Amino acid sequence: MIGRSGKVMIVLYIVCLVVLFLMCSTDLIIREPERQIYQIAVIIEDVRSDNYSNFRKGMDLAAAELNADVQLITLYEKLDVKEQMDLMDREQQDGTDALIVVPVEEEQVSAKQMTIPVILMRAGVAEAAGAGNVIVDYEKMGEQLAREILKEQPADVPVYVLTDPAGQSDMDRLFLKGSDAVCQEAGRSVQRILRGEEERFYTTLEQPGTEAQKVVILAENQDILTEAAGVVAGSEAVADAVGGLYGRGTTMAILNYLDRGVITGICVTDEFSVGYYSVREAVRALEGAGSVPTVMESYYIDKKDLRDPAFEKMLFPIE
């Protein structure tokens, strides 16, 4: 039999085990190291975030993996550089750890003095970008798309460029600079259709007999391309007169029009990876790790490419 002292020892042993269990389960002994949650603000150049769907998915994945809290901020007035720079100041004052900015005007924004890391989504070439920036070379993208147009369309088909000079971003400007250079070198006829002149242009295309002389339409950005595709899809006469509709962008509306054959071809970049890399570079900057500019590739795709596994994964990333 166990004596009185033995029973006491057993009780004390059990009590010690319970206490040790409680201490471990409440982190009183084994404490998990606390990781800092980085506050990162992403300020884009637009008034809405529709065009940043895949970008945001990549951004959210990086935030989850790298212990960051990311907030996407839009402008009240599209392409308002003063508002964007004021927002940068506001976020810094509010304690944001780092900024990711899609600049309205690259030169002004890049020259702005900040005390926190700023990752820029540059629209120019890599040589013009600093460490940590993510670059999509829109001039090269425009050149690439123009070469595809020249390859696919007969030499006597005129190219009409839909553009909005008053609301043109650096991305739009560089994209058209690239396409213009290729068309000019090839001696291809290019005419501008300015914002506000589209209705008259489409009315002309609807006139009887115009379908005999096909035209090619090139849109400078996603919004203009979506609008043009809506017109082509809604008018049989315009559709008959348009030999090809081209542009850039990866919104669901654009991809649906491409799948339907309304849009002939688009240039795209991996926007999911752009979002991911931008957050990654912001965290690297905060942790003092070295980084170099990340240069993104551009790709030309048409309807058949939507079923290509590589492009499908890029255009329709799983959240």
Where are these regions (language model features)?
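Hydrophobic membrane-insertion alpha-helices, especially the h-region
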Residues: V8-S25
